[in-house]
From Swiss-Prot:
Location in the cell: Cytoplasm
Domain OBG-type G, first and last residues per copy: 160-329
Annotated organism of origin: Mycoplasma pneumoniae (strain ATCC 29342 / M129 / Subtype 1) (Mycoplasmoides pneumoniae)
Family: Belongs to the TRAFAC class OBG-HflX-like GTPase superfamily. OBG GTPase family.
Top EC category: hydrolase
Binding-site positions, Mg(2+): S173, T193
GO annotations of cellular component type: cytoplasm
UniProt cross-references to HAMAP family, sorted A to Z: GTPase_Obg
Gene name as annotated: obg
GO molecular function: GTP binding; GTPase activity; magnesium ion binding
Protein name, per record: GTPase Obg
GO aspect biological process, one term: ribosome biogenesis
Xref: PROSITE patterns: G_OBG, GTP1_OBG, OBG, OCT
Domain named Obg: residues: 1-159
Amino acid sequence: MGLTDYCECRFSAGNGGNGIIAWRREAHYDKGGPGGGNGGNGGNVVLQADHNCDSLFFLKNKKHLFAESGGNGKPDLAHGKNGEDLVIKVPVGTTVRDLDTNQILMDFVHDQQSFILCYGGKGGKGNAAFKSPIMRAPNLYENGDKGQSLHVSLEIKYLANVGIVGFPNTGKSTLISKLSNAKPKIANYRFTTLVPVLGVVKHNDQSLVFADIPGLIENASEGSGLGHYFLRHIERCEILIHLISLDPVDHDDPCQAYEQIMRELSKYSQLLVKKKMLVVANKTDVDLDGTRFQKLAQYLENKGIPLFKISALKQELGDLVAQVFALHQKTLAQFGANKFHLPMEMEKHYVFEQASETDHDPLNIERDALGRWHVECKRLHYWFDKIPQTTLDNIRRLGNKIKEVGIEDQLKVAGAKKGDVIVFAGQEFVIND
């Protein structure tokens, strides 16, 4: 199974079942009466974070997934069966985005965190539900509501406290392998690491998750190479280690290397360059006379930025680890005990808009070149879908709903007259009075 950390899919909740018209025929109910049951509710689409799940591979080739629809009502007052929920398990760290609005719907940061992505439709009423002292034998029933449907992207952004960033071949993989029990592929050529590698680093009875972010290249923020693919994994990190190689084979100028990486981070998101960051010079064992380190240290000192030096190969890492954990403690004091800080856009709340019986949106009336009146109204659409025009009682009920919306009065104000044609929901109607 390959590692898949991005996919797009449409999810649809189940439709509500339809109510029915039926009449009681039991021996002990000689007067009969309405007996049509209600439709069952449609199943929801539920996403749930699971720490045992580490990939979106199972969704990679799925274009459209459906929850079960509710069953139709039955005779003898029997209701339809509710549809089963469709429960999709996703890795912790998955972000869900609505592709139509580009809005983040959910960010899973805890194991077993769940979210109803699409709500199932409510079941329609059968004629038994309309029985009253005034209407003892109603020929009324309803269709079930449609389930919600969304086209979304699912994207894993790895949950790490510390992200190690830099150009390819700066020693990031070597560093994380010496700090933790991670086993990245290490070789002396560019682009050895193609996916982020996570490792747990312990210090004084504390532990942090470090991530080796694959090497960035120039214009990574614009998608060059696998730029966007790599940069998005940095968004959750609270601390960044900016690793710069002192080996002249890797960079002509370490100062220029620093600026290029900072430029790519800034172009991708200003939030990245505002993160707490340690700039670290690696491969000091190659810089024998120390001139390249001194040049970089002086350059950063002029900017008020301290520079740490290490040799990951020789495991000279004690001071760096202590500095990272000290910085982490300052972060905890500032933000509290939350390990992972969500993007600011997650403060917004997602609200799904669909037609309902309580909608009071404005009525839109326009006249075409043929003199027909085109009417648009979300609430009216709801009732046209809800009430089948198959019985006289249903047609009268739909007529009452149209009057409640006030369509007749607004058509008169717009200039409509007797005999004019009204177009709504793909149907044509003639004004009779």
